[in-house]
């Protein structure tokens, strides 16, 4: 089992006691695990305050992590290294900073994670490349309706992730 929460900053000085609050926690049992062991994993997630505790098979876990974590880190890294315009940091807004926050990455840990899950990550990279190629084609063909449709679909999907604000 493991959390789906972290921080791009290294070191104990960057620890955060609320890092797991409203985060997701994934239990990945194998045929070697007992029901009691799985229950203990779930209880740990509850004690730490995770908002959602899910269970995935090892295969489904690897595919999901390849998509929601490793692909996103790869996209952020690629975005930061694909262009060498000078002083770009002087011209960015929140969207660029939000999208690239995770490009500040622990290369020792993440290179290992990428290679340990390379088949799933390669699969997700292929799917992403196909989708970004569709956008490129629509731009080349000035397909405004196609672009708008892609934007509508992405907006609808993104709404599924929005968490309701907790009133303080």
Language model: regions and residue ranges:
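Alpha-helix N-cap/loop-to-helix initiation residues
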Residues: 7, 33-34, 121
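Interdomain hinge/lid region at the active-site interface
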Residues: 87-157
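A short beta-alpha structural unit
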Residues: 61-66, 153-159
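Rossmann-like NAD(P)(H) cofactor-binding subdomain of soluble oxidoreductases
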Residues: 1-13
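Long, positively charged, glycine-interspersed low-complexity recognition regions
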Residues: 162-168
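Short, flexible, solvent-exposed loop/turn segments with mixed acidic/basic and small polar residues
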Residues: 13-19, 112
